[in-house]
Amino acid sequence: MNKETYKKMTGFLHSHPTQAKIVITTNKIITYAIYLAYPCLLLWLIFHNGAATLLEGRIDPLLSKAILVPAVSFIAVSLFRALIDAPRPYEAFALPPVIAKDTKGKSFPSRHAFSIFVIGVTFLAACPLPLVGWLILALGVCLAVVRVLAGVHFPRDVAAGALLGIACGCLGFWIV
C-alpha cells in the first residue's frame, strides 16, 4: 500500500462518519466476540472431558493443546513483532488512522489477525461443531480487511498474521 492509496481509503472513511463507525464497530464486535468465544471453548473442554481427567490427576491432552498452542504461539509472535518493530501505516504516511490508535511500530505481523486465525484453528481441532471454527476463520478475513481499511495495518501485516495463525494452529494440533 502506498501513501495515496492509504490517504484515499482513510480519507473516505474520515469524510463519511457512518461508514467509519461501521468499520470501528465491526472491529470491536469481532474482536470481543472471539475473545469471549475462546474461554467458552476452554470451559466446554474442561466440563466435557477435562474434569474427569483432572479428578484422576491427569490433564486432558486436547484441553492442554487448546491452551498451549494459542498461548505459546501468541508469545512467540509478540516477541517476533517486537523484534521486527515495523511501522504502522499511520506512522509511515503521517496520516491519522480511522481507529484511534497511537501505538508505535509492532505492526508486522498483525496480532489481531494472528489471534483470530489461531483461535479459529483451535476451534476446528477442539470444538465438536466444526462450523464454529470455519465461522471464526471467515470472521478473521473480515477483521483483517477492517484492520487495513482502518489504517492500522498494511495488507502484508494481516496476511502474515493470518498465515502464521493458521500455520501455528496446524503445527500445534496436527503435527507436534
Model-based region annotation:
Residues 43-52, 126-127, 174-175:
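Structural signal for the C-terminal ends of transmembrane alpha-helices
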Residues 1-39, 50-54, 61, 77-105:
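N-terminal transmembrane-helix/juxtamembrane module of multi-pass inner/ER membrane proteins
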Residues 97-176:
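Membrane-embedded catalytic cores of phosphoryl/pyrophosphoryl-handling enzymes
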Residues 18, 58-62, 89-90, 128-133, ...:
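Membrane-helix interface segments
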Residues 65-73, 77, 161, 165, ...:
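Alpha-helical transmembrane segments in multi-pass membrane proteins
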Residues 16, 32, 70, 74, ...:
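Residues at alpha-helix boundaries and the short loops/turns that link adjacent helices
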Residues 30-46, 72, 135-138, 143:
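Hydrophobic alpha-helical transmembrane segments
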Residues 34, 55-72, 111:
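Generic, well-ordered alpha-helical segments
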